[in-house]
From Swiss-Prot:
Protein's UniProt name: U4/U6 small nuclear ribonucleoprotein Prp3
Domain PWI: 1-87
Keywords: mRNA processing, mRNA splicing, Nucleus, Phosphoprotein, Spliceosome
CDD domains: Prp3_C
Subcellular location, record wording: Nucleus; Nucleus speckle
Gene: PRPF3
UniProt region (Disordered), positions on chain: 73-109, 162-183
InterPro entries associated with the record: Pre-mRNA_splic_Prp3_dom (IPR013881), Prp3 (IPR027104), Prp3_C (IPR010541), PWI_dom (IPR002483), PWI_dom_sf (IPR036483)
GO cellular component assignments: nuclear speck; nucleus; spliceosomal complex; U4/U6 x U5 tri-snRNP complex
Gene3D superfamilies on file: PWI domain
Summary of the function given for this chain in its UniProt record: Plays a role in pre-mRNA splicing as component of the U4/U6-U5 tri-snRNP complex that is involved in spliceosome assembly, and as component of the precatalytic spliceosome (spliceosome B complex).
UniProt biased composition (Polar residues): 170-183
Assembly: Component of the precatalytic spliceosome (spliceosome B complex). Component of the U4/U6-U5 tri-snRNP complex, a building block of the precatalytic spliceosome (spliceosome B complex). The U4/U6-U5 tri-snRNP complex is composed of the U4, U6 and U5 snRNAs and at least PRPF3, PRPF4, PRPF6, PRPF8, PRPF31, SNRNP200, TXNL4A, SNRNP40, SNRPB, SNRPD1, SNRPD2, SNRPD3, SNRPE, SNRPF, SNRPG, DDX23, CD2BP2, PPIH, SNU13, EFTUD2, SART1 and USP39, plus LSM2, LSM3, LSM4, LSM5, LSM6, LSM7 and LSM8.
Amino acid sequence: MSLSKRELDELKPWIEKTVKRVLGFSEPTVVTAALNCVGKGMDKKKAADHLKPFLDDSTLRFVDKLFEAVEEGRSSRHSKSNSDRNRKRELKDVFGDDSEVSKESSGVKKRRIPRFEEVEDEPEVIPGPPSESPGMLTKLQIKQMMEAATRQIEERKKQLSFISPPTPQPKISSSSQSERLPIGNTVQPSQAATFMNDAIEKARKAAELQARIQAQLALKPGLIGNANMVGLANLHAMGIAPPKVELKDQTKPTPLILDEQGRTVDATGKEIELTHRMPTLKANIRAVKREQFKQQLKEKPSEDMESNTYFDLRVSITPAQRQKRTFKFHEKGKFEKIAQRLRTKAQLKKLQAEISQAARKTGIHTSTKLALITPKKELKEGEIPEIEWWDSYIIPNGLDLKGGTSSKKDEYFGITNLVEHPAQLNPPVDSDTPVTLGVYLTKKEQKKLRRQTRREAQKELQEKVRLGLMPPPEPKVRISNLMRVLGTEAVQDPTKVEAHVRAQMAKRQKAHEEANAARKLTAEQRKAKKIKKLKEDVSQGVHIAVYRVRNLSNPAKKFKIEANAGQLYLTGVVVLHKDVNVVVVEGGPKAQKKFKRLMLHRIKWDEQTSNTKGEDDDESDEESVKKTNKCSLVWEGTAKDRSFGEMKFKQCPTENMAREHFKKHGAEHYWDLALSESVLESTD
């Protein structure tokens, strides 16, 4: 439920105090947002969402307090409205009734309800200790007010020709108050004094109550507006002027004074500059709060540690501080040394790879050759051999390695003191032209492009017809639109028209079929298209893969290798040797990918192979069963040209024969790689 403007004005001071208590400082933006939430009748959830950007974690607590204050304000206004209805009293409730006084003269005096008793009963308005309130009247001020009221009464009596003593009369008792007033225009002096004393007593109580209210309002500025001015006006209307009360701790705002030019001036007329409050960001607010918190920590008095029995003056207390980070400059040449070290390491690895590759090419891989190369005599520790074992394989036998001049025939041919730097050639496979991906249209774009093309072709035909270059096409007549196209002709001779329409339909169907037949490929064209799709362009380089199979005696597996190589248009060779069956294939990357999946995944090499040698070789069969058959990829890469033709099988009983077959095609290193892996596997 939304609140009125008056209720929002009453609620605004409380919201300002709550914001200051929650945030630690006043923020007009939050106050305005809270007033908007209450004024629009939002519930707690919506108000919390609206105020969360301003208050963060304190939002729920602030919203609960806000709605509690709104409910208290509604209940207080409701009770106040009920009390206002009962507050309308007649004059007899204040001054008493003559008939009632005469009837109850013998009894106890009737209690008269003061005007401000209801206000005095409210615990929220009257503060606890009256002496502490800055706006409460002192005893001296009340005495001055009483003397002023007495003087006014005396002057009034003189005007009414009543004689009364100058001193103020004391309070009359209950017996004197119960006297009946005479009926007539004349009033007795005693009765007039009684009335005046009652009026003075009521005025004194009203002044005390008004002073308390003023003190309470001074603590809460702007809560009820100018309520104190209303009370002062009532006192002046009664003829009693209360003395001025100086409030030292008054928190009312300074009145705004403007000169003729609209500038802000003080009481002396001097121009002053007002502080302009501008909205700020949340980050700035947090920064201010952080600085205030640090200042409070600095100003916090330190504890008296000297009184502690465990305090040692010799130990210095140094707070934990973060060390400042300084610049650390690298020495000159540091990264050059690191790069040189990495280059040296890479060259060493490359040299080791070249040495191992040369050893494989020369055939230094079997255990027998290694045994021949190793020195026969054992050298003692610290003894230097005449020749190293790796040089003994190269240097011819009978060479005198002792001191002396060597003859010209012992000199090596082609060895000089010059270093040959071969010309650098570009790699045959890598192309300098960048690879660009084609742009593929979506289905929607393809349809749009097709519509545009057909529309342009149709426009071109229409232009030719319009210019007379070609006759206009016949109307496309169907059975469904027969009557609409031909009209009266169809009505006159329907049979003739139907035959004409069917002839046109057959003509269109025939033209369509002829166009399809013209576009259809012949058997040779389809075959060439399929071959072109399977054959790949190897002008930039041929992809080569070398496989090693332990046992390739099964004819079914041989047929699979040969058939798939022919279907994928791969070239190569299969060399059959005991425990070393080498398969070399050459072709494009797509075909190599399919053949690799065939060799490593599709063919089950560990299946039981057929015994082609008969029943005589029982021992060899047992050994083959113990060794599980498998296929491994030895090497794959690229070369400039093909080395082999159509896929063929070659039976080689010895290693030299197999190597010679590869050497004839310039690919003996394939055999060396496969054989070295087989030797290493057998030694393991």
